[in-house]
Amino acid sequence: MKFFIVLALCIVGAIADPVSSDQANAIRASWAGVKHNEVDILAAVFSDHPDIQARFPQFAGKDLASIKDTGAFATHAGRIVGFISEIVALVGNESNAPAMATLINELSTSHHNRGITKGQFNEFRSSLVSYLSSHASWNDATADAWTHGLDNIFGMIFAHL
């Protein structure tokens, strides 16, 4: 029962302050420019935060340059970017809030079970935004849209950690 109460609160929280249609469009437009750069996005995260790389047994202790061009790296990068793409596709439509909550809850649960901390999620966020701001069409409105959307998503994640 407690789970359903927390889930309901997360959905209400996301709905209470959803991104606007213009913000959703800005998020989608900027994401469209980088969503096929899966390997580069994950490499940027690992380069910025080696502690995150260390959380992946198949990549821990290895030089980033030696793993970046491997199939295992590309596959995992595709999973991460694919998740973000799913969320980006759903953002901006309040009727999608339950679907977003389900995806985010699954991510939260699996990462909680692996001992991933709020700090590491925030590190990931920082690297993602840094990558976006330097590789996508970016302005103040786009930055505000991503901040708003990520605040909603990370609020939901942190409610489950």
From Swiss-Prot:
Amino acids binding heme b: H76, H111
Source taxon at top rank: Eukaryota
A GO CC term assigned to this protein in UniProt: extracellular region
Keywords: Heme, Iron, Metal-binding, Oxygen transport, Signal, Transport
Keyword hit for Metal-binding: yes
Domain Globin intervals: 18-161
Gene Ontology MF, one: metal ion binding
Similarity comment: family membership: Belongs to the globin family.
Subunit structure: Homodimer.
Protein name as it appears in the record: Globin CTT-IX
